[in-house]
């Protein structure tokens, strides 16, 4: 289906795409203390801090002895993580120097109230699990989380939207900056009690997704026991179309942004499936796929293309990756004002930490680029044919090696259509690569805290003061 504007797309168009969407709504609870320690919850946040701590993150094996793909991806970035800490808002628990305190009972009561408002079946015992986070947003490398209820629903326009589960977990740090191999966080909101309401993929149009998000937000606010304001509530949106895969758009801060984000993601997936079909038509398969990399620094030493020329003046190197059979593919439109080349550039930016844009050039691109003579010279040296595309990447030797590998991996993923990814919501309604979508191997039991029984007395006490559920 040809891409079109949101305002020109009908529910029937989304039905033809087979679009489905679900939500993960995160909402801070208005507790006095944090979830697993007794540090105060202070809002609004402060920009002041008393000290900095440096950490490096490394993946650990899951309960089944396997590594999570997202954790391995984050480890590949070789990031140094700096935490800006304020004595008033953190303790040794957040820095992973002491075990957790008992679960905050006030937070548990509020979370159970919202779980019942969503009509979920309550668990009989609370079991804490650990969810790996190797991006550094939690100093321990994992988030403590628990499920409180499953299989609920809320009414919406004559039907019901299913609630898969509601969980209670600790909030992560606030990111300050992410440049090269250095990522900086502030720890003031770290450990805040947070609920995560997860719906089934029951929404069929972008507008429905936004309206259901609004319903869930209003329901949580009806308790009067949640924080409001910037950063207190965040939405993750899951989108898939027929033939595609679930893609998570992470951290949507404003509900009005949701329709355009969902619309663009649906048509991005349609474009990726068209690319897959075109590669199949050309006979490019997993068995025949080739991506050959070579150092071409000397071949482009005199280039006038400014981004590359500056890198070479700084003593960096250039590497060319030949994608066999990919001619024209990188110029294929995937989102408004965006082509498949950005799918590759994003991977290089995030994983190889080459975040000075542009970080790649390719032989099919129009506008400012290398001269035709330089491209011909590279093609000849790399033995590229008329059906091939060359992607050039430049930077520090170690990062360029990683970048060349990511170019090949993302091109290989094109043969499968839509990769499972977590993607970042951008202000213009498009999205960009953030990380590989996590799998079940990121979860494992927490051994520091015992189970907590959810008694009938507790349920009745909460039910006696809660609002009537929809």
Predicted stretch roles:
Residues 468-470:
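Conserved nucleotide- and phosphate/pyrophosphate-binding catalytic cores
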Residues 1-466:
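Basic, nucleic-acid-interacting segments
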């Amino acid at each position: 289906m040809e891409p079109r504007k949101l305002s020109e797309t009908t529910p029937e168009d989304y039905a033809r795409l087979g679009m489905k969407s679900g939500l993960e709504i995160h909402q801070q609870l208005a507790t006095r203390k944090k979830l697993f320690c007794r540090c105060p919850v202070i809002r609004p946040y402060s920009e002041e801090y008393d000290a900095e701590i440096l950490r490096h993150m490394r993946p650990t094996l899951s309960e089944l002895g396997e590594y999570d793909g997202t954790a391995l991806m984050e480890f590949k970035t070789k990031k140094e993580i700096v935490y800006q800490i304020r004595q008033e808002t953190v303790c040794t628990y957040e820095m992973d120097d002491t075990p957790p305190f008992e679960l905050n009972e006030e937070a548990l009561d509020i979370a159970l109230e919202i779980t019942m408002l969503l009509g979920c079946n309550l668990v009989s015992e609370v079991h804490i699990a650990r969810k790996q986070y190797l991006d550094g947003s939690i100093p321990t490398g994992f988030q403590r989380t628990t499920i409180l209820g499953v299989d609920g629903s809320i009414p919406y326009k004559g039907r019901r939207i299913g609630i898969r589960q509601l969980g209670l977990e600790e909030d992560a740090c606030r990111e300050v900056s992410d440049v090269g191999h250095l990522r900086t966080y502030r720890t003031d909101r770290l450990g805040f009690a947070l609920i995560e309401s997860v719906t089934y993929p029951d929404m069929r149009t972008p507008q429905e997704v936004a309206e259901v998000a609004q319903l869930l937000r209003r329901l949580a606010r009806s308790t009067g026991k949640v924080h409001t304001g910037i950063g207190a509530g965040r939405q993750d949106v899951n989108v898939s179309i027929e033939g595609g895969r679930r893609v998570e758009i992470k951290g949507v801060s404003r509900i009005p942004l949701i329709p355009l984000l969902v619309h663009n993601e649906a048509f991005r997936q349609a474009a990726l499936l068209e690319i897959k079909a075109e590669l199949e038509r050309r006979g490019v398969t997993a068995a025949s796929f080739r991506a050959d990399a070579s150092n071409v620094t000397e071949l482009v030493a005199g280039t006038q293309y400014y981004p590359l020329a500056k890198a070479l003046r700084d003593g960096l190197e250039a590497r060319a990756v030949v994608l066999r059979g990919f001619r024209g593919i990188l110029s294929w439109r995937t989102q408004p004002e965006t082509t498949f080349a950005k799918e590759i550039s994003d991977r290089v930016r995030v994983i190889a930490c080459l975040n000075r844009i542009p970080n790649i050039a390719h032989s099919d691109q129009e506008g400012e680029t290398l001269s035709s003579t330089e491209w011909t010279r590279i093609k000849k040296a790399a033995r590229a044919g008329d059906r091939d595309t060359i992607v050039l990447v430049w930077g520090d030797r170690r990062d360029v090696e990683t970048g060349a590998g990511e170019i090949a991996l993302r091109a290989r993923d094109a043969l499968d259509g839509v990769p499972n990814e977590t993607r970042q919501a951008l202000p213009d309604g498009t999205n960009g690569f953030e990380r590989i979508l996590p799998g079940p191997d990121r979860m494992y039991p927490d051994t520091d805290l015992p189970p907590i029984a959810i008694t009938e007395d507790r349920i009745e006490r909460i039910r006696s003061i809660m609002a009537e559920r929809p």
